[in-house]
Regions:
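Short hydrophobic/aromatic-enriched beta-strand-loop microsegments
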Residues: 99-105, 213-215, 273, 309
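Conserved beta-strand hairpin/beta-sheet module of binuclear metal-dependent hydrolase folds
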Residues: 10-70, 74, 203-214, 220
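C-terminal regulatory/interaction regions
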Residues: 1-6, 283-344
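Metallo-beta-lactamase
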Residues: 45-46, 52-54, 151-174, 181, ...
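Residues at alpha-helix caps and immediate loop-helix transition turns in enzyme cores, especially N-
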Residues: 35, 57-60, 90, 269, ...
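Aromatic/hydrophobic pocket-lining residues that form the small-molecule binding cavity
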Residues: 61, 239, 317
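Active-site HxH/HxHxD metal-binding segment of metal-dependent hydrolases
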Residues: 56-58, 64-183, 210
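Histidine-centered divalent metal-coordination motifs
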Residues: 79-87, 105, 195-197, 201, ...
């Protein structure tokens, strides 16, 4: 089992001087927990990525606070690294209950697209938590999201009012521009915009202490999902540039990711992630050469194992195909509402 998939424990770790890690339970493809970091200063506590919404998740979050030696009332700031539900989920409620500030990147999306992450398990029920009906939505490549069974559709519609509240993104109090500085937990952090996994992803770097809060941008053993949901975008190029950007930060000696365990060698990990995506681009090119002209869903089956087939695999395949196309290495045409790709 990869470390990002390990189930959450209630152990509280000091992962850098003055920075505590709390693991919160999570059920997403390949993920068993999200790391919530706590930084103490004279005003109280800053929390980074407080996990999922919902009563059960909230109860566990408050229990983790207690184990870490503080209470909800001590939280004055919540940092949200990006607009995915496992990172911002509890932030709005913390803001409401503790009158805390919410800090994001200046590009933070004030809406959430669940097709970025596929299914999540919410309060014991695996669902597609979108206030809309995702199975009615078209994809940029002309496909449709799978239509769930009737009982799931009915339950989904019944829960929609509650889900609309739970899955609302927070309104940021502070939007950090790239390279802007902010003092949190007795450290001065530099905002590092790192689009790729999402357009609004934020890392925080402490130059003096050598600590990087990397969110989902750099994970220890897996790569974050690169979604091709936004038509016309090239998130893979953005991701490569953002990898190089953090790799060039001077003096990083400790990386604190949102999933998995802290690690030290950022440069080596960035090289591994680059290599992984270059290998996938080569594999996709080989498949396209064999198939000739083909839709995204067909090419996706040559890039991912069968257990991973579905919307997430298709969106990442689309992102890689668009990267090839925009780089002049592939072409596409539309036929009956679907995009067909071929390599040059």
């Amino acid at each position: 089992m990869r470390q990002e998939a390990e189930p959450a424990t209630d152990e509280i770790d000091e992962v850098a001087p003055g920075i505590l890690r709390m693991q919160l339970p999570l059920r997403m493809p390949g993920l068993g927990h999200v790391n919530c970091y706590a930084l103490e200063d004279e005003r109280g506590m800053t929390i980074v990525d407080p996990g999922m919404p919902g009563p059960q998740a909230w109860k566990l979050l408050i229990e983790r606070f207690s184990l870490a030696g503080f209470q909800l009332k001590h939280v004055h700031t919540v940092v949200v690294t990006h607009s995915h539900i496992d990172h911002f989920g509890a932030s709005g409620r913390i803001r409401q209950k503790a009158n805390a500030n919410v800090v994001t990147s200046s590009t933070f999306r004030t809406w959430w697209d669940p097709t970025d992450v596929g299914e999540v398990e919410l309060e014991g029920e695996t669902q597609q938590p979108d206030p809309r009906e995702p199975w009615k939505m078209s994809t940029p490549w002309g496909g449709k999201h799978p239509r769930p069974p009737r009982r799931v559709r009915l339950k989904y519609r019944f829960l929609r009012p509650m889900m609309r509240r739970w899955f609302a993104t927070p309104s940021p109090s502070v939007r950090l521009a790239d390279a802007e500085r902010i003092t949190l937990g007795k450290r001065e952090w530099v905002s590092v915009h790192t689009p790729g996994h999402t357009p609004d992803h934020l890392c925080l770097f402490d130059p003096e202490g050598g600590v990087l809060l990397s969110g989902d941008h750099v994970l220890p053993t897996i790569t974050p999902h690169i979604s091709g949901i936004d038509a016309g975008a090239d998130p893979l190029t953005d991701f490569f540039a953002s990898l190089d950007k953090v790799s060039d930060l001077p003096g990083v000696t400790r990386v604190l990711p949102a999933h998995g365990h802290p690690f030290d060698d950022l440069t080596a990990r960035v090289k591994d992630i680059h290599r992984h995506h270059e290998e996938r681009l080569a594999k996709l090119t080989e498949a396209a050469e064999r198939l000739g002209e083909a839709p995204v869903e067909e090419l996706s089956k040559h890039l991912f194992r069968q257990r991973s087939w579905g919307p997430m695999a298709d969106s990442e395949t689309y992102a890689h195909l668009e990267h090839l196309r925009l780089g002049g290495k592939a072409s596409r045409r539309e036929e009956e509402g679907r995009l067909l790709y071929s390599v040059k």
